[in-house]
Regions:
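Compact integral membrane and secretory-pathway proteins
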Residues: 1-149
Length: 149
């Protein structure tokens, strides 16, 4: 089964989680920081570091997990798909919040000033929140299913 068929086999909530992970990854090309003067911006890729790498790895791992779920594979117990996706969403959100406080420095003529936040970092935060919310919803469905059995 190809990855496109695997995505087609996902439930609506699992697709919502995939959308959140894709938003987190795609937001790296949007402006995350803007200079205090001149309208200059810095994207997530423009200020790439270990935190941004962790953000992309987390989003990629969530998408890889969802593709495996679409192919009919589940993680071994005690791991649950919903819990793993929620953890990925909270972790990605934590990374974005860290990057909100760890802004690059803008230097001009010997003066240093922090970049201001731009819209891309909030898009990434929204994607992380969507991933976490979908993971919690999936986990709730899993728990209800476990109680019935």
């Amino acid at each position: 089964m190809g990855w496109w068929q695997a995505i087609g086999a996902l439930t609506a909530t699992e697709r919502l989680a995939a959308l959140g992970a894709l938003i987190c990854a795609a937001a790296t090309v949007l402006p995350w920081y803007k200079a205090p003067i001149g309208g200059l911006v810095k994207t997530g890729l423009g200020s790439f570091g270990f935190a941004m790498a962790a953000q992309l790895i987390t989003a990629g791992a969530a998408i890889a997990l969802l593709i495996q779920v679409g192919r009919g594979r589940r993680p071994p117990l005690p791991l649950h798909v919903g819990a793993l996706l929620a953890a990925a969403g909270f972790w990605a959100g934590g990374i974005v919040v860290y990057l909100m406080f760890d802004r690059p420095q803008f230097e001009l003529a010997g003066f240093n000033q922090d970049y201001a936040l731009a819209h891309g970092i909030f898009v990434a935060l929204g994607g992380a929140a969507l991933l976490a919310m979908a993971g919690l919803r999936i986990r709730h469905v899993e728990r209800v299913r476990e109680r019935r059995n």
